[in-house]
UniProtKB/Swiss-Prot annotation:
A GO CC term attached to the entry: extracellular matrix
Gene from which this protein is expressed: rpl7
Organism for this UniProt entry: Dictyostelium discoideum
Keywords: Ribonucleoprotein, Ribosomal protein, RNA-binding
Name this polypeptide is given: Large ribosomal subunit protein uL30
Family, as annotated: Belongs to the universal ribosomal protein uL30 family.
Record has Magnesium as a keyword: no
Single Gene Ontology BP annotation: maturation of LSU-rRNA from tricistronic rRNA transcript (SSU-rRNA, 5.8S rRNA, LSU-rRNA)
Function: Binds to G-rich structures in 28S rRNA and in mRNAs. Plays a regulatory role in the translation apparatus; inhibits cell-free translation of mRNAs.
NCBIfam families linked to this entry: uL30_euk
CDD domains in alphabetical order: Ribosomal_L7_archeal_euk
Length: 246
């Protein structure tokens, strides 16, 4: 009758056991971080959605109020005068050949260093005077919500450490502007549209918009818009130009 010989299992070296324990701990930690990140993302997505809903409601309310006031004015035989625009969108349409030093300096202050670059500008006495100085070299007017959204979603870039980085996620917004309560792209759009209290910080964080040449081209760059050209203030008609260049 054969006898079974007991075999001894060689002990696992302590170094390997330590490596296994470390690997298992890392796996557990990664899993915990993954769950924590999922919960955080879920909470943030809920916040983003609620903010977007709030802004849409606010925009609709403003629009309905304007329609109501216009109807009242019409029924009473008067005219409804909408509130003065608070924000302009300025597009550089001419080069610097022959530009005198003062307009050249203003173009630099406006960050309009290249042709077909566009920027948002908060309208006040000082900025209006600056725009008058550079009117022969720019086209500007009052962007609507649709234009602002399309510009930011399609051509928005953030200035991060002096570099032009595509605006591709809400995380980027929060890292750059979270200290001002701006945590998502819709916050940026709202701040620009309403000319909010952090307009300056938000606008400075946006790289100038690089636009295309307008479909169909310009008519007469050197001629004022009111005389059938392209230069200067075109008020709400700037939205047509933005659409052609975006």
């Amino acid at each position: 009758m054969s006898q079974k010989v007991a075999t001894k299992t060689a002990p696992v070296p302590e170094s390997i056991l330590k490596k296994r324990a470390t690997s298992q701990k890392k796996a557990v930690d990664v899993a915990k971080l993954g769950r924590a990140q999922q919960l955080r993302n879920s909470r943030l997505n809920s916040v983003y959605f609620k903010r977007a809903e709030k802004y849409v409601s606010e925009y609709h309310k403003t629009e309905r109020e304007a329609i109501r006031l216009n109807r009242i004015a019409k029924n009473s035989g008067t005219f409804y005068v909408p509130p003065a625009a608070k924000v302009a969108f300025v597009i550089r349409i001419r080069g610097i050949n022959g530009v005198s030093p003062k307009p050249r300096k203003v173009l630099k202050l406006l960050r309009l260093l290249q042709l077909n670059n566009g920027v948002f500008v908060k309208l006040n006495k000082a900025s209006i005077n600056m725009l008058k100085l550079v009117e022969p070299y720019v086209a500007y007017g009052f962007p609507n919500l649709k234009s602002i959204k399309e510009l930011i979603y399609k051509r928005g870039h953030l200035k991060i450490d002096g570099q032009r980085i595509p605006l591709t996620s809400n995380d980027m917004v929060e890292k750059q502007l979270g200290k001002f309560g701006i945590i998502c792209v819709e916050d940026i759009i709202h701040e620009i549209t309403t000319c909010g209290k952090h307009f300056k910080q938000v606008n400075n964080s946006l790289w100038p918009f690089k636009l295309n040449c307008p479909r169909g081209g310009f008519n007469m760059k050197k001629t004022p818009f009111l005389q059938g050209g392209d230069a200067g203030n075109r008020e709400h008609l700037i939205n047509n130009l933005i659409h052609r260049m975006n």
